[in-house]
Amino acid sequence: MTQDEMKKAAGWAALEYVEVGSIVGVGTGSTVNHFIDALATMKDDIKGAVSSSVASTEKLKELGIEVFDCNDVAGLDVYVDGADEINGLNEMIKGGGAALTREKIVAAISDKFICIVDNTKQVDILGEFPLPVEVIPMARSYVARELVKLGGDPAYREGVVTDNGNMILDVHNMKITNAKELEDKINALPGVVTVGLFAHRGADVLLVGAPDGVKKFV
């Protein structure tokens, strides 16, 4: 299996968690795009989706799936999204696609978080993938200095504006041994919208596309 074939396998495997008549939370990224393709095969059996990004919204609509505003739903049964890294506790780094804030919001209103990845995303310790932090533009330099104090090496992601109109700092050289504590510390910095650590709201189910098929971790 190629890496993309493993992503596709994980994306299609998530379809079993979608309930008939439901509104489905949909994340962002290359693996999620495969899930959206799968979801389109049962578009007549679901009410629609809540999307975490403009890109996913466009793809959902192109495939004929109705997209609801997050503010118009009280909650979701399931949220399906990928990850840039995920550890053995199902804690994740997300935000490589700059949609981390909206992803956190949709995850927060969902009863179950299904994470879909290929096997290259599984790690023992989070941090080799740069940790994204969404910041309000005027706070960029201040937040960067504070991230250095926390042991990181932040870099401004050039040319990227989030769907919320903000900037991304990617924090390199972090070995994250206490993800919940670091999530709290970074989120407490004035000017931070959110950090791409999904530790307090980790995945409930992990579906991993591997050369020998899809593996499930709970």
Swiss-Prot record:
An annotated GO cellular component: cytosol
GO BP annotations listed: D-ribose metabolic process; pentose-phosphate shunt, non-oxidative branch
Keyword Isomerase in annotation: yes
Keyword list, A-Z: Isomerase
Annotated S-S bridges: none
List of catalytic residues: 103
The keyword Transcription is assigned to this record: no
Pathway annotation: Carbohydrate degradation; pentose phosphate pathway; D-ribose 5-phosphate from D-ribulose 5-phosphate (non-oxidative stage): step 1/1
Chain residues that bind substrate: 28-31, 81-84, 94-97, 121
Reactions mediated catalytically: aldehydo-D-ribose 5-phosphate = D-ribulose 5-phosphate
EC number(s) given by UniProt: 5.3.1.6
Function: Catalyzes the reversible conversion of ribose-5-phosphate to ribulose 5-phosphate.
Quaternary structure, from the entry: Homodimer.
Family statement drawn from the similarity comment of this UniProt entry: Belongs to the ribose 5-phosphate isomerase family.
Name used for this protein in its record: Ribose-5-phosphate isomerase A
Naturally occurring in which organism (per UniProt): Aliivibrio salmonicida (strain LFI1238) (Vibrio salmonicida (strain LFI1238))
